[in-house]
Amino acid sequence: MEGGIRAAFSGLNDVRIDPTGGEGRVLVPGEVELIVYVGEFGEEDRKVIVDALSALGGPQTVQALSVLLSYVLQGNTQEDLETKCKVLTDMGFKVTQAVRATSIEAGIMMPMRELALTVNDDNLMEIVKGTLMTCSLLTKYSVDKMIKYITKKLGELADTQGVGELQHFTADKAAIRKLAGCVRPGQKITKALYAFILTEIADPTTQSRVPSMGALRLNGTGMTMIGLFTQAANNLGIAPAKLLEDLCMESLVESARRIIQLMRQVSEAKSIQERYAIMMSRMLGESYYKSYGLNDNSKISYILSQISGKYAVDSLEGLEGIKVTEKFREFAELVAEVLVDKYERIGEDSTEVSDVIREAARQHARRTSAKPEPKARNFRSSTGRGREQETGESDDDDYPEDSD
């Protein structure tokens, strides 16, 4: 019987289990076709734009988005459109022009009517841009998280960005659900949103606004893992390559390779918009950087979180629970302690320290031997909230957090 079982299972050593279904695609702009909506606007077309703004979240959401995207990319001149298309083609993307909707039916559901009523000739462009950036967040937030963001954060944030009118952005659940259904990764309209955000980042006059309001930190693109890794290396005061050398372990090899690959790609980007193109790539499709999330690389992510937790617990509160076994948690905490001790040596036997430093080291040694060092924070909860440090952004407790 035993021989029969062995025969039945022979060859399984050559079968690789890949629960993620593949690593996913790496962003290669030349393989991506972006959409730019076009259609001339005249003075009499202002009503079409306002109607499109009103219609967001209703039955004509896609048509409305096409009008708004055409307006912000094209403006009132053909030269504006050509300049922005050149930004995208210079990055290597293929650009295809699509005809926008020509009208929006009056009288149908208008969920954003309250926002549209705040429009005038002076603020129209800024309101439309802010609205589109807000819509792009639906590629990273669930409907419930988006409603929380709108009700607790958007008004204050928009006011600091000079678009206080966005406090009237609807939080109606049916409208947000409709928007979320239209703005999904890989959709034609989502690729047009992606193109719009990249052109805004490339423009020095709007560049600073986009990180605050746009979908620049998407789940699963690996940027949280990169942020953890960079933060840990910085805290230890060592080069990234040295940290990877210290973490040499068979089960971490694949994760280390992903870190190196993504860091290299980001570092080789020639412009800020090229870096953000990588960070936002999940807007183009769920397959991008599919295995770069924290829980796809849970072991190295947990070790890195423990290292930085030795320095500042609150710097890691934005991370949701990283799934590792209790046994590995204990091991990771020990690895973090050993690494910190290695690079935070406070010795009194060196010939290149002053008497003051030597005496302080003696007292430090006595104190630490008298009481156990507290462990780094153990991230077991899946509801942790706080802030991340991957892009230099900071969020308060009312801001819906996300992790890769």
Curated annotation (Swiss-Prot):
Pfam families membership: Rhabdo_ncap_2
Region of interest (Disordered), residue spans: 358-404
Compositional bias annotation for Acidic residues: 391-404
Source organism: Viral hemorrhagic septicemia virus (strain 07-71) (VHSV)
Source domain of life: Viruses
InterPro entries: Rhabdo_ncap_2
Family that this chain belongs to: Belongs to the novirhabdovirus nucleocapsid protein family.
Gene name, Swiss-Prot/TrEMBL: N
GO molecular function terms noted in the UniProt entry: RNA binding
Keyword Phosphoprotein set for record: yes
Subunit-structure text: Homomultimerizes to form the nucleocapsid. Binds to viral genomic RNA.
Name of the protein this chain belongs to: Nucleoprotein
Compartments, as annotated in UniProt: Virion; Host cytoplasm
Cellular component per GO, a single term: viral nucleocapsid
Function: Encapsidates the genome, protecting it from nucleases. If expressed without protein P it binds non-specifically RNA and therefore can bind it's own mRNA. Interaction with protein P abolishes any non-specific RNA binding, and prevents phosphorylation. The soluble N-P complex encapsidates specifically the genomic RNA, with protein N protecting the genome like a pearl necklace. The encapsidated genomic RNA is termed the nucleocapsid (NC) and serves as template for viral transcription and replication. Protein N binds protein P in the NC through a different interaction, and can be phosphorylated.
Regions annotated as coiled coil: none
Keywords: Capsid protein, Helical capsid protein, Host cytoplasm, Phosphoprotein, Ribonucleoprotein, RNA-binding, Viral nucleoprotein, Virion
